[in-house]
Regions:
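N-terminal segments that cap or nucleate solenoid repeat domains
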Residues: 2-48
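Intrinsic low-complexity/IDR segments
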Residues: 3-9, 114, 172, 180-184, ...
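Short, well-ordered alpha-helix to beta-strand connector turns
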Residues: 13, 22, 31, 40, ...
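Glycine-centered beta-turn/loop sites at beta-strand termini
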Residues: 18, 27, 36-37, 45, ...
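Extended low-polarity, hydrophobic cluster-rich segments
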Residues: 33, 49-52, 66-68, 86, ...
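Conserved positions within tandem-repeat grammars
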Residues: 59, 77, 86, 105, ...
Length: 198
């Protein structure tokens, strides 16, 4: 089946299946579910609501929607766009990069081995969580409420931006005695709660 027919399948059925190769997927329509499979995939969304299972590989997701949820495993993930509400869940190793704007964005990276989070954007609420062995978090942006929970044994947190209230927590994952990492805060806030347990 050609790419055009596969993309039209999403428009009319709300489902789009990729391969285990490097796919270029356009998801345009009211909404639905994307199963990208393995490989290095590029996904362009223009929908009311979509959930994308990006699997393994280095994946790039771009576009806009009222609701966007991405579920990723191993490999780097790059997300860019404008969404009213966004959720990103990453369970395997690899970096996660987000560039965009939204009313609210929730990022949860639980890959054990390694994987940084790089955030650049703005939202009324930014909720960022990283749990694993090794990771840095770099935040540049603005939000009404910013919450960053950094739970790794090794890694630094850098915050550059502003918010109505900023809550930053740096803690250890599974080895307190060997944990290390700094918090670098360069920002403004109506209120700031900054805590380090390493």
């Amino acid at each position: 089946m050609s790419k055009i027919l596969k993309d039209l399948e999403f428009t009319f059925t709300g489902k789009r299946y990729g391969t285990d190769g490097n796919d270029d997927i356009d998801a345009i329509g009211f909404g639905g579910i994307i199963y990208a499979g393995k490989g290095h995939d590029t996904i362009t969304v223009g929908t009311f609501a979509v959930t994308a299972y990006t699997g393994d590989g280095h994946d790039f997701v771009r576009g806009g929607s009222a609701y966007l949820k991405i579920i990723d495993e191993n490999g780097d993930l790059d997300v860019r766009g404008l969404n009213a509400w966004g959720e990103i869940e990453k369970s395997g190793h690899g970096d996660l990069k987000y560039v965009g704007a939204s009313a609210a964005i929730k990022i949860n990276h639980t890959g054990y081995e390694y994987g940084n989070i790089n955030y650049s954007g703005a939202a009324i609420a930014n909720i960022i969580t990283r749990k694993g062995a090794i990771s840095n978090i770099n935040y540049q942006g603005a939000g009404g409420y910013n919450q960053i929970w950094h739970e790794t044994n090794t890694g630094n947190m850098t915050f550059k931006g502003g918010g109505g209230y900023n809550k930053l927590v740096r803690t250890w994952f599974n080895s307190y005695q060997n944990s290390k990492g700094n918090i670098n805060f360069e920002g403004l806030g109506g209120g700031n709660g900054i805590f380090s347990r390493v």
